[in-house]
């Protein structure tokens, strides 16, 4: 029996390639790059995991950031970060740069123009927290988010695998109404892998504000067991189908080797 004719109007997902031999800095193209993290469920962990593995990196922010003095060698609170870079000693790396301590538990961030100046002056990678998520695992950006400098090389949209199967509510999701608008789902609906992928791959979601010459490399974090891995692989496959990104990184950022899998 002959196979049925192929309908040329139907798009078929090609099988995704998988590998686990890529380290985090290579997977995120982070060496000597300006890397901006957005989304929820692993932004700060990504910044610090990269900072631990790169040569003379800067950690900074264009939005509020929790106190991180214990995650870097030194923090300079300064309105003149370029001078602080020039004056940094060999023992100051990774170096944190922030403009002001807003309260006991967080710093303010610089405007994007200043972050761009930091990146231009930095001797290595500049790692930037570029939006907030209020400790949730999944989000869509607000009206004035993200805050990405124009010279960003890599933008990393992040979500946690743990949201799959959970309800679309404020308990785990920052701005669930915006997520619902992007995905066409209703508040309270069960979050599917396709919903996470839709947000991460959307110009109104994870790809919002990505400069034209920057590379977006999505991350699905908190891949803690095989169920999480299955959900993360499904998310990754959908992202690769929907968006022009080179790969999706599956991570467990609290692990010594944080890359679980690279899906290309």
Stretch-by-stretch model annotation:
Residues 23-54:
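Walker A (P-loop) phosphate-binding motif
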Residues 106-107, 120, 133-243, 261-263:
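Conserved catalytic-core segment of NTP-binding enzymes
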Residues 37, 57-62, 96-99, 126-130, ...:
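General beta-strand structural signal in soluble alpha/beta enzymes
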Residues 19, 44, 49-106:
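N-terminal phosphate/diphosphate-binding loop that engages ATP/GTP or pyrophosphate donors
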Residues 59-64, 242-255:
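Beta-strand->loop->alpha-helix junctions that form or flank phosphate-binding loops
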Residues 90, 96-138:
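Hydrophobic alpha-helical segments and helix pairs
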Residues 2-4, 24-28, 40, 117, ...:
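Core catalytic machinery and nucleic-acid-binding channels of phosphodiester-processing enzymes
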Residues 1-34:
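Extreme N-terminal, non-catalytic leader segments
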């Amino acid at each position: 029996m002959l196979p049925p004719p192929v309908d040329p109007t139907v798009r078929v997902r090609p099988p995704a390639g998988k590998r686990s031999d890529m380290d985090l800095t290579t997977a995120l193209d982070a060496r000597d790059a300006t890397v901006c993290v957005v989304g929820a469920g692993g932004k700060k962990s990504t910044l610090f995991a990269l900072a631990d593995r790169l040569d003379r990196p800067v950690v900074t922010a264009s939005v509020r950031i929790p106190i991180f003095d214990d995650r870097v060698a030194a923090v300079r609170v300064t309105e003149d970060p370029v001078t602080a870079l020039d004056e940094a000693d060999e023992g100051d790396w990774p170096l944190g740069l922030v403009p002001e301590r807003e309260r006991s538990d967080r710093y303010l961030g610089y405007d994007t123009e200043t972050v761009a100046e930091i990146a231009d002056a930095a001797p290595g990678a500049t790692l930037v927290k570029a939006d907030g998520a209020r400790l949730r695992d999944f989000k869509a950006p607000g009206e004035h988010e993200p805050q990405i400098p124009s010279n960003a090389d890599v933008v990393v949209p992040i979500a946690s695998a743990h949201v799959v199967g959970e309800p679309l509510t404020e308990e785990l999701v920052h701005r669930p109404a915006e997520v619902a608008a992007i995905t066409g789902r209703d508040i309270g609906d069960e979050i599917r892998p396709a919903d996470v992928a839709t947000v991460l791959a959307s110009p109104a979601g994870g790809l919002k504000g990505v400069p034209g010459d920057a590379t977006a490399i999505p991350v699905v974090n908190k891949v803690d067991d095989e169920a999480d891995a299955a959900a993360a692989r499904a998310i990754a496959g959908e992202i690769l189908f929907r968006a022009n990104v080179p790969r999706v990184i599956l991570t467990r950022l609290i692990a010594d080797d944080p890359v679980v899998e690279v899906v290309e």
